[in-house]
Amino acid sequence: MRLFPVRFSAASSSMASLAKMLDFYSGFNPSPLSIKQFMDFGQNACEKKSYIFLRKELPVRLANIMKEIALLPDNLLHTRSVSEVSSWYVKSFEDVLVYEKAEPTHDNLQKFVADLDLIRNRHNDVVQTMAQGVIEMKENEGGQVDAPTESSIQYFLDRLYMSRISIRMLINQHTLLFGGNPHAGGRHIGCLDPACDLSDVVRDAYENARFLCDQYYLTSPALEIQQHSSEPGDNLPIRTVYVPSHLYYMLFELFKNSMRAVVEHHGHDNNDTLPPLKVAICKGKEDICVKISDQGGGIPRSQTDQLFKYMYSTAPQPSKSDLHTVPLAGYGYGLPISRLYARYFHGDIVLLSCEGFGTDAIIYLKALSDEANELLPIFNKTSSKFYRATVPTGDWSNQVKYAKKKKTSAVNQ
């Protein structure tokens, strides 16, 4: 097999052993958990049970995505930044394997929590560093990336970042429940809020996005919130079991986009004349929807899908010196990663836009916690084939592009 382009400090026998363990653990599928399972375990938390589960599950999730890293196109895999990310995954995989057969003694349990903290911190900059790797690849290729390579990168980054979200979820739950600073007396179960007030998270995300908007544009649109429930007896505000930080990330990104669109579309008018952002929080039997509606001029339908692509950004690329001061600035990763957060527990983000008027962004969440299961990437023959596949030739006419290339039509003839 092809190992990552990283330098191992251990001998070649250790490299062979690592490859063997990668093959072993990547042969298992990850075990997705539901929000209900996270809650049930957290309410009756047993550190030894969590330790025994994680010492097997974390290597499986790491190995599955590490196998896919090795399948990346060579011109991306061998960039400095991607090599660095690869080395982080190798080190974390080795760190977790230390506990493969270690008994859950008090000392081992304490050391396990400390090592999980180190692993989480080690991977803090995965998103930014991978983005820098893509930039390096594009620069090395003269700014041109062929369609098959772009398709492979889009496919891989969705899976890498979803895997990262899931691994951080497992680590955060364990360290919050059994670390040195648990939420003593709070209602949170690890990073889950069993009664998450959606309108509170909406207001929090709005206020922080508004602060940035006011700083840059000296004005910002107001906020209006409405709440609706399909059950007449439901109390308002609408609450659900969720990870508030995940929802906040999605809302903050969407609010930033909407505020910028509104202010720029309406010519930096005063707050009183800017149309407000309207948020509708709706609870049904199957879905909970949070809809943000703006009057920011909308997006052409041809560009909507592009907004979720990692290789597409309308903003200038950041310099390396800005990498840590302005997280994700210029990479255009906010929307695609927001959608991954929504999809992680089988929700989604959908954009509906009317060009010339405005855009509706809808966050879908599962209303029932036992249906909110993790969506996890699995390494298998299907996924490995994707990296070697070419983009299929279109078998439908594309009238828009066709008209641009060939003005004379059968009708005109």
UniProtKB/Swiss-Prot annotation:
Transferase found in the keyword field: yes
Single GO molecular function: pyruvate dehydrogenase (acetyl-transferring) kinase activity
Record's catalysed reaction(s): L-seryl-[pyruvate dehydrogenase E1 alpha subunit] + ATP = O-phospho-L-seryl-[pyruvate dehydrogenase E1 alpha subunit] + ADP + H(+)
Domain Histidine kinase: start-end pairs: 137-369
Enzyme class: transferase
CDD domains in alphabetical order: HATPase_PDK-like (cd16929)
Entry-linked Pfam families: BCDHK_Adom3, HATPase_c
SMART domains found in the cross-reference section: HATPase_c
Keyword Plastid set for record: no
EC number: 2.7.11.2
Subcellular locations according to the entry: Mitochondrion matrix
Cross-referenced PANTHER family: [PYRUVATE DEHYDROGENASE (ACETYL-TRANSFERRING)] KINASE, MITOCHONDRIAL, PYRUVATE DEHYDROGENASE KINASE
Function: Inhibits the mitochondrial pyruvate dehydrogenase complex by phosphorylation of the E1 alpha subunit, thus contributing to the regulation of glucose metabolism.
Name by which UniProt lists this protein: [Pyruvate dehydrogenase (acetyl-transferring)] kinase, mitochondrial
Gene field: Pdk
